[in-house]
Every structure is written in C-alpha cells, then in structure tokens.
C-alpha cells in the first residue's frame, strides 16, 4: 500500500507539472489579430458638368494619393500612398496596402487626384500645367479631392467620392473669315494651396498670373485653373496661323468659381475688339 501511495503521488506530481507548464505556455504566447486590409470604392461627383450630361471617369493608369489619419488626431499613419487604376480589370492597385491599426482605431481618409510623388502630409501646393493644349496636360491639371471621416473598422469597403476643386474655363471664339486659330491662352494664377483635411483649396495669393495654353475641344477651347477672380485687362490671347494676335480684355474682375464651368463668347470680328 505504501508503494502504491508513492507511485500515485509521483504520477499526480508529474501530471500537475505538465498541466502547469502547458497553461503557462498558453498564457505567455500571444496571437495578435492581423491588420485588416482596406478596400476602397472610388467615384467622381457629376456636380460640375451635370447640366451638360457629361461625366468624368477614371481611365487606365490614373493615379490617386491617399492619406490615413487616426481619427481625432493629426497622426498620419498612411502618407500619400499611390493607388493606380487598371482599366483591363477595373481595379485599383497600390504600392502597399492600407490597413486599419491592430488596436482597432478608426481612421479618417483623404485622397486627391492626380497623384504627385514626394508630397508628405495633407497640406501642400498644387500647380496646373502651363500647357494644357494636349489631353495629358489638361487632365493632370484637373485637381480632385475626396474624404471619408465616418468609416468603421468593420466596413467591407470605404467610399471616396471625388469632387472637382478647380474652375473650368471654356471659350467660344469667332475669328475673321479666312483665319485659323493656332492657340488660345488664358491669363491666370496656376497654383493652389491645398488642405485635404479641411477640403480647402485656395489660389496662392502672392503668385503672379501667367498665360496658360488652353486645349481645343470641338468648337471650344478649355482649361482648368484654381478658382479665382481675374484681374482687369487682357484675359485671353488668341493667336492665328497668319501670325496675328487678338486680345480679349475685361474692364472688371470676373469670378471663376470652383467646380463650375464658366463660358466666354469671344468675337474677334467685332471692330471694337
């Protein structure tokens, strides 16, 4: 009986040690939940062009920059990540995926188009192309921005609805018979000061206006510029193939509002022109 008692005691001791060690191992080893990758749904508001039945679409190779800030703070967790569009698969891909923090914190998202490498933080300057006569110069000047400050960690996707933040100017031009328009330029400031968190876009006040070459689009010429009030004087410069130059002058300041199209009708055959 004594021998049996000792064996039972030893067996019990080893069993206790095994259970104790197993429990300690489980307690010490941590298994963090993986960070949840974020899926974005991008769309563009029709606000500016709805009256003409037009709509802006993202096209193959377009790039947007995205920032992720911890909600309630100014801490930037994702800084100007590059997302680009693949038309063949109708998908957006990124240089590195955006995830919610492991601690479950919510994020505010801010985005802009077109993407500019080297930007850090949600406050920066953006300048339109001085030559917008070709599609690339025009489209890469059309600044858009978006925000989402209501997303939750368990959302299946995050919607970012982009809005046109610049003014669009169009000019319908009539030149004397026999003349052919070579180029049309508008005198305006090129640079805007951006605050994505506030969705604020303002023209750089101390910048001098320059002539920006407009893009021919059907019977009109067009350009996108930061919203601004034009100064008095020579607003448009029209150059024709014969070498002659026509000027369209204003006698008062003209407002060019953001997210709107302002159309000018210019008749170069008018004797007073």
What is the meaning of each model-derived region?
Residues 13-17:
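Sec-dependent N-terminal signal peptides of Gram-positive bacterial secreted proteins and lipoproteins
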Residues 2-8, 18-273:
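Sec-type signal peptide cleavage vicinity
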């Amino acid at each position: 009986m004594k021998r049996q008692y000792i064996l039972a005691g030893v067996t019990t001791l080893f069993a206790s040690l095994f259970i104790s060690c197993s429990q300690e191992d489980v307690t010490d080893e941590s298994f963090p939940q993986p960070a949840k990758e974020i899926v974005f749904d991008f769309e563009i508001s029709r606000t500016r062009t709805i009256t003409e039945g037009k709509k802006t679409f993202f096209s193959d190779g377009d790039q947007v920059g995205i920032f992720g800030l911890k909600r309630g703070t100014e801490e930037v967790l994702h800084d100007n990540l590059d997302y680009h569009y693949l038309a063949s698969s109708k998908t957006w891909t990124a240089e590195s995926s955006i995830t919610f923090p492991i601690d479950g914190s919510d994020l505010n998202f801010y985005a802009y188009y077109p993407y500019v490498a080297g930007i850090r933080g949600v406050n920066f300057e953006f300048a339109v192309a001085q030559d917008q006569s070709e599609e690339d110069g025009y489209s890469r000047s059309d600044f858009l921005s978006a925000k989402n400050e209501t997303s939750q960690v368990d959302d299946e996707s995050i919607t970012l609805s982009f809005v046109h933040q610049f003014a669009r100017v169009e000019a319908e031009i009539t030149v004397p018979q026999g003349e052919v328009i070579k180029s049309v330029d508008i005198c305006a400031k090129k640079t805007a000061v951006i605050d994505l968190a506030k969705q604020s876009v303002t023209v750089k006040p101390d910048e001098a206006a320059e002539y920006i070459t407009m893009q021919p689009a059907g019977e009109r010429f067009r350009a996108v510029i930061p919203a601004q009030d034009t100064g008095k004087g020579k607003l448009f410069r029209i150059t024709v193939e014969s070498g002659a130059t026509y000027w369209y002058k204003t006698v008062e300041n003209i407002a060019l509002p953001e997210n709107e199209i302002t159309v000018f009708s210019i008749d170069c055959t008018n004797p007073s022109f």
